[in-house]
Amino acid sequence: MAAGWGPKLQGRLAEYAKMKDTVLLGSIQKHMMREADKPSDRRQDIIHPSEMAKTGWCPRGTYLRIKACREADNPYLKPKENIGVQLLNIFDEGHYIHDKWQRRLWAMGELWGRFICPACDTDHVNYVSPKFCDNCGLSWEHMVYKEIALRALDPYLIAGHADGGVPSKRALIEIKSVGAGTVRVSDPELYKKYSQGQMVDLPGLWKAIETPFPDHVNQGQLYLAICQLMGYDFDKIVFLYESKFNQGAKEFVVDYDPKHSAPLLDSAYAINRALQGLTDPPVCPHNGCTDCEGKDYGTTITEGVGSAGEASPSRATNTRPTRRLRSTGPTRKLGGVPAR
């Protein structure tokens, strides 16, 4: 039989075929795939800020996903994804980069958020860099940081997590690992300038990044808007970029602008109302895309409901008091006094 006869294996089938010739690597990669295939613990019945922030976000696709979750009575319902080992490695590397920057801020006494003790399961919420578990005394080096939960479920149905907060700077932090693929997706023109075919000028590409990418700014502004709704006193977000190819680091600071995220909040509000049957489902901004037509959510859409004409709350002025972050002794927590 001639070499190369038959269809070329692609995706996971190709990866499985390569694994047969390894001593250890193949077993590790199979383990990675099995772990990735386990049911996700990430809620799919809410709107994620990270999806809203993308330039090509399809509100209709988000609507369909949440509607399917409700019909199945399963908040974790998600179409099966065949993620390859290379992409799994990319995800893991991003997690490691997040962890090291968060732990540096923790060691400095600057990191605010939620901390878990794995020894006794004590939940430390709204703490600043605890040095030990309040319940069992476990040292902070063995505790786990669970970031900052951000919720705007009513009326926006939005829920997510910020990478951290630094009260002394009144700043949220967002940590981004940046590789050639990041730039290719986030700033195609910049990528094109420093690439030729498969060849990429990585040092030049990294040096040329002088502002945070638009999708990242969208995400950060959404986080800050939700902080205002929750009463958290953060007025800026600091982006920490780390280069995947040479571990270089950059910082970008973006001040809160309520006008920036208002259209996204309007879209989230419209999705929530459509899910309640109060208005029509959102239309696809791309006249059909993989998010709304390329995924089988197993749900149906009722059109022609019309709009109740109620304005989005994002157009109203937020009059809620803001809680300041202040010191309360050996372990600093979130204070309850209004700002200004």
Placement of each model-derived feature along the sequence:
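Metal-dependent nuclease catalytic cores that hydrolyze phosphodiester bonds in DNA/RNA
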Residues: 1-172, 179-199, 317-328, 334-337
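Metal-dependent nuclease catalytic regions and adjoining charged, substrate-binding loops involved
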Residues: 4, 10-17, 127, 185, ...
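Alpha-helix capping at helix-to-loop junctions
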Residues: 107, 178, 229-233
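Long, contiguous hydrophobic alpha-helical segments, chiefly transmembrane helices and signal peptides
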Residues: 158-162, 175, 216-222
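A structural signal for short, well-ordered beta-strand segments and their strand-loop junctions
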Residues: 165, 171-175, 233-241
